[in-house]
Amino acid sequence: MIKTSFLAAFVSATVASLASASDLNLNIQTHMLNHVEVGPGQPIGYTITGELSDNASDGLAMFAFDLSWGGGFLGQADVPVADPMKRFANPEGLNNPAGFGGTPKNGRLFQIGGAQNTINNTVAPVPNGTVLTNVAQHGSPVILATGQFTTSYRCGTYTLAATNLFANVIRQGETGTPFWHVDPCGAGTIQNLVIDVHAIKPNVPTVSVSAHQQQVLRLNAGPNNAGRQYLVLGSLSGTSPGTTQNGVHVPLNVDSYFNFTLNNPNSAILVQSMGVLDSTGRGSAAFRPDATFQNMTANHAFILLNPTTFVSEPESCVVVP
């Protein structure tokens, strides 16, 4: 329904063949990466790059896709202000009524993108631009859309994913007289952006008792939790099925070490296990095992107190002699 609302005229008036001339590939990244680990409540900027699979056309004429983010609110993508993308956005191009950045609905963005003025419209106010050729040709990818979101305050893995991609390309050799013929473009590969939200970052995975080593646990509960009290807990018997503390599931199994960390905060074994997060929601603790921990794997996680509304993921530490 949404697709036909703003592109029907372009598709029906200028597409003469149902055979796909090229495929459009998408790549969603942040800082040129498709998979990153960040803390809770962190702002993330993303780019969505498009590239045609070959040079069998004269470039992109129209594109649209949906975007979903499993980690919370997703606002509209940015309105383009420079070429080539401003040729695809109102008023130079044509996009859906909600804007080039997509229609927000049920936590998703529907139909990000737009079309160039391939019908050479001069009657209606929109579209009123001139067509750019060779947009997103193979070997010359372009940024189709940019935007921002904030990571979840619940630790886990989330994906910014594009779906329902459809596009047209300008037929090779076209001059724009009387209009620009376009051909269907297939949906190519889509590389989504995967975000791991972690609240603990250990400095090392293994410590030696004889070398008097320690594992420093850098805590990050996000800026909304600044100034709150935290408690680091531990277990020597794994993370599943875990237990419940003050109504919140904690991914640590109850054993003697768990009870020790619960009832003896700030011990010589788990230094600074209870404290107050700083103005950015960060803190630190340190695991300093003695000989009784040799050849064991300790797991640690932290919760926030009063009330207990936040729990981190577990992080492990292998203790060697």
Language-model regions, residue ranges each:
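Bacterial N-terminal signal peptides
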Residues: 5-17
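Short, functionally important structural connectors and interaction interfaces within domains
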Residues: 7-10, 30, 267-269, 285
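Acidic, low-complexity intrinsically disordered segments
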Residues: 21-205, 229, 288-321
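Residue-level hotspots within well-ordered secondary structure
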Residues: 198-321
